[in-house]
Amino acid sequence: MKQEQKHTENSSSGIPSILSKVKLLHGDRVLWVIIPILMVISILVVYSSGVKYDTPTGNSTTANLWKHCIIILIAGIALLIAYRFNAKFYRKAAPLAYLGSLALTVAVYFIGDSTNGAARWIDFGFFMLQPSELLKLSTVIFMARQLSMKQKSITTQRLVPSFNPLKWREPAQKKIWIEGTLPVLIPVALSCAIILPAHTSSAMLVGAISIMMMFIARVRWQDLLKIGAIVVVAASLFVAIGAGRSTTIRNRIGTFFSNNEVPLGSKPLNQLTDTEHAIIAIHDGGTIGVGAGQSVMRAKITHPESDYMFAFFVEEYGIVMALFLLSIYAWIFVRAIHIFRHSEWIFAGLLAVGLASLVTVQALLHILVSVDAFPETGQNLPLVSHGGTSMLCTAIALGIILAVSRQIEEGSLIPTDVGEKFTTPTDHNL
């Protein structure tokens, strides 16, 4: 009866009813509309940005377009495959997916190719794989599993042991390590530590999303404060001792603050940073943009097709379309919250919100960099920027969210354990 009521609510929530007649498109109708829109936008802007790399014969732009269309097609197929699996499958597969992506991310430091001084890619000949993207995705799925398994005792279970190592042999501290720290915190710490040397902002993203999921899952606020303190201390030490890409981090932060010291108009054009070129692109775009394919700044920005896609999009299509694009990402998160609140299974709800947050927070970081409100991160615009692994992982994440929404609609989202079932509104912090 409860599932029928939820189905009725979902069907009458202003979602495009025409899609409900399409048998393959069960689940959240809004997401089924949003995702193809983002993919079409991606094809348009990646094609236009590719003119920067064009040759006199024009072959490079066309080849770049076809390559990106193939990536979009593969991503679409991956989304549909992910959509067909049930939440129980993802719960069972989470440990294996996590360990596999962890191993690949470690391997990249030994056999991978470097970009901008950081080992990030494994070259398979026909495809360049970025394992850190897989690890981001699998960590969120694994965290949803671990937190849901702890729901019976989550409000009383301590996750952070004493800061005094001498006490760790005490029975109470051993219990904290075995039941809280090892199953919940260590996987996140491992993911962040392995990603950090090559892609600092991705490690930050994984950590932030994981803490947010802990908050939603009702982890004790005392533990959340301790985790926050540990993160601040660890990050400070990382930068202080010059580990990994800490020099690059310091340089980017320094560039971010120095950009505002000298007025943009008083700088020689050949001394402008990519972010400053992005600001000019946004200014030139104005309300309606300069028109598709008419960008000037794409020739000035190092990676208009990835790192500064939002600025490039605003230049060609204007602020109005940029606001539309922003609303799409915001709506993905809103729909995930809707799915979460209609889920009776804590794992599935955390899965939807965690994956949606991974997409939307990454989009937010990308946009903040483009408007010079945050230091350069190298994060691309999900499902829009050029990038095979990122596109594939984003599509899988959205496919999983759609799978959860489909099961809610079908009434087949049944918790594997009664302890993982929502019983009252106080079972979560969302």
PLM regions and their residue ranges:
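Transmembrane helix boundary and interhelical junction motifs in multipass membrane proteins
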Residues: 199-204, 289-294, 304-306, 374-377, ...
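Extracytosolic (periplasmic/ER-lumenal) interhelical loops and adjacent juxtamembrane/interface segments
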Residues: 272-291
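Cytosolic juxtamembrane amphipathic/interface segments immediately preceding
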Residues: 12-26, 59, 166-170
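Short linear Ser/Thr-Pro motifs
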Residues: 39, 48-50, 201, 295, ...
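Hydrophobic alpha-helical scaffolding
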Residues: 23, 243, 267-268, 299, ...
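Long extracytoplasmic/lumenal interhelical loops at the membrane interface
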Residues: 286-320
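A juxtamembrane structural motif centered on a specific transmembrane helix
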Residues: 1-19, 147, 362-430
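Hydrophobic alpha-helical transmembrane segments of multi-pass inner membrane proteins, especially
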Residues: 32-48, 55-271, 311-372, 396-400, ...
